[in-house]
Amino acid sequence: MFHNCRMEGSCNAETTSHVTAVVRAPIFCNCFALCLEIPILWDDLLYRHEKLLFGGFTCNGGAELILNSHCCLADAQMWQVHCHCSDSLSLQCLSATQVLKEFLEEFVMGGFVNKKYLWYREFVNSSRPDEINYVGSIMFRNIHYIYFRLSFFSTVHQACMLAIQRCISPELGVVFKSTYNYWLVLKCKSCSLQNYCALKSCAFWVRSIIDRVLREVEKIPVVLHRTTSKAEERRQTALKQAMMYGRCRHIQNLCLVNLNAFLHF
């Protein structure tokens, strides 16, 4: 299927799981709330001792949004992570819980870039189709992780995924299926110092990568409208108003879920 997917860690209906950690993330992570999840590239992010402790029981689903009747973009949201070990009361699972929670608290703080540099999303998604949509970023352990949600019609979905993968080397990024969506995550090391000029260069670099991806996908052929969609404009406006002015918009009214991923097509 996808050569650089971490399929061994994917969630599915036959996999047992239990909630092992819950964290409250600041509102700058709420761009991911629109997708109901923050995928976590465990193999890339974990230190060796962390992998030994809980790396084998995690999945690409990462942190899932805990939905409630008042999920507002202007409020900090609760996120949960599942463990896929066979015994939630085992010594390894219990000892990993606190380490995992501390890891998650550090990880979500890397989303500050989404509020500090609101222009980044607007620039990267400008005149780009919703099928490859920049969602948000996480700065973590000196690497900038750049998240794109992938959404294509089911008739061409597999061909599009393979076309995208042909453009993305393991050093450049990864393409994979999470719980609710398909994702492309690019990795940039040049803007790890959180410098404006470096981040601006990163944004131009990202657009060039996505241009290359779009050209490859259009060979299938697939018709992609290279315009900023009205839906994306609404998401940008809602996020800006929530982060800058505290205006509440219900997440459920703006959320994005890829039915292909959710139904495991």
Curated annotation (Swiss-Prot):
Signal peptide as annotated in the record: none
Any Pfam family matching the protein: Adeno_E4_34
Entry superkingdom: Viruses
GO CC entries: host cell cytoplasm; host cell nucleus
InterPro entries for this protein: Adenovirus_E4_30/34
Subcellular location, record wording: Host nucleus; Host cytoplasm
Keywords recorded for this protein, A-Z: Early protein, Host cytoplasm, Host nucleus
Quaternary organization: Interacts with E1B-55k.
Family affiliation: Belongs to the adenoviridae E4 30 to 34 kDa protein family.
Protein's name in the database: Early E4 31 kDa protein
Organism of provenance: Canine adenovirus serotype 1 (strain RI261)
